[in-house]
Design a protein with these regions (language model features):
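Soluble ligand-binding/transfer domains with enclosed cavities or grooves
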Residues: 2-384
């Protein structure tokens, strides 16, 4: 995997910690930071592989040239095999929010940085996404009445900012990852889908990047099944994994009632000329689900002398080509060699961003599976 060095998402000055500005000059202890809730799992740096699809606008003024000439089209379907690094900084502390109708509340959260490279062409990584942002934990409210929620605040270099709010829950075992359809639809009429020839993997004469998917079909990396349902990649990654628990986080810029709040803001270029109501590529909605899974691995520990420590990869299984974390053993004496069970977090996500142009709404889908970038310490309980 092309290495991306990110120790933290965003570096904060030493000693910086959110809290309430005191109303008296007499020194008082800082308030304890509120719970991060499900966001406590967002610690350190994760990396992994994924897949991205986006229908891009195509125009006569700055057309994209393709290996094989195709009839004029208002769009190009871009497909990306991806490498991703997702890095989290330490929690912010107690972030006060003042209320007029209800009492004040305090939030807590973690800054993050998401960096994605296109690696469709081996040896030629291309940066396609850079997203600094915040994940914030919001306590339960009585005015408005709303349970505890999480919020993702994201800034996208193309000219879009996102506020997506939602809820979380825990399930035992593997998640049930639903299918995702990339087919565009008539704006405001999601049942009126408009499929395009570029969604047919075997058709090499369509406005698509890459245009010829033959080599990828042969390699099993971009297939018709993947175009029909990008989330199938996530299910492949976990098919043979032993997952004990899953924290599920669902967020949206337009969450379903009783939740509300959130939204999207675009720069003028994306909105287009308001007089003609013809956006260039207006982002109108984002929704995503994150599955934070606890994976149980087997690692084979050789004989070790007291004081020795070793970095070990798990015993390989059919993992769908996905990365697995490394583990570092404590300095204990091990004799004879043994296989032990260890656990580590894994983040999977499926995200849909909806763009409006030329009378249609175009789903932009991203999926990935991410594991800890640094070796995971083996806990003492693994030796019991």
């Amino acid at each position: 995997m092309h290495e991306v060095r990110l120790d933290t998402a965003l570096s904060m000055p030493a000693g910086f910690r959110f809290s309430e500005v005191p109303s008296h000059t007499i020194a008082s202890p800082l308030a304890l930071a509120p719970s991060l809730g499900p966001l406590a799992a967002f610690t350190g740096t994760f990396r992994g592989h994924g897949f991205n699809t986006i229908f891009r606008p195509q125009n006569a003024k700055t057309p994209t040239t393709l290996p094989e000439l195709v009839p004029a089209s208002d769009n190009i379907l871009e497909l990306n095999l991806t490498e991703e690094t997702l890095s989290f900084s330490p929690g912010l502390g107690s972030v006060p929010n003042r209320g007029e109708v209800r009492g004040d509340i305090a939030l807590n959260g973690v800054p993050y940085l998401q960096v994605i490279n296109d690696v469709t062409v081996p040896g030629r990584p291309v940066g396609i996404h850079f997203e600094p942002g915040l994940w914030m934990a919001v306590p339960a409210l009585d005015d408005p009445v709303e349970g505890a929620t999480v919020v993702r605040m994201a800034s996208i270099p193309h000219g879009t900012t996102v506020q997506a709010q939602g809820e979380s829950f825990i399930i035992a075992g593997k998640p049930d990852i639903p299918s995702i359809d990339i087919t565009p639809f008539v704006t405001a009429q999601p049942d009126k889908k408009i499929p395009f020839p570029s969604q047919t993997a075997a058709d090499g004469g369509t406005p698509r990047i890459p245009q010829d998917l033959g080599p990828f079909i042969a390699a099993g990396t971009i297939t018709q099944a993947l175009l029909a349902d990008p989330a199938s990649l996530l299910r492949t990654h976990i098919a043979a994994q032993s997952i004990t628990t899953t924290m599920v986080i669902t967020i949206s810029t337009a969450p379903a009632a009783p939740l509300f709040g959130g939204g999207i803001s675009n720069i003028a270029f994306l909105l287009g000329n308001p007089a003609t109501s013809a956006p260039n590529a207006q982002v109108v909605k984002m929704e995503a689900t994150f599955w934070i899974e606890t994976i149980e691995y087997d690692i084979e520990v050789p004989a070790l002398e007291l004081g020795q420590s070793l970095r070990i990869s798990p015993v390989r299984t059919e993992d769908g080509g996905q990365l697995v974390p490394e583990f570092v053993t404590p300095p204990l004496r091990v004799n004879p060699p043994r296989i032990i069970k260890v656990s580590a977090p894994q983040i999977q996500y499926a995200q849909q961003v909806f763009l409006n142009f030329n009378g249609l709404t175009w789903p932009h889908v991203s999926v990935a599976t991410l594991v800890p970038a640094a070796p995971v310490p083996v806990s003492a309980s693994a030796w019991a």
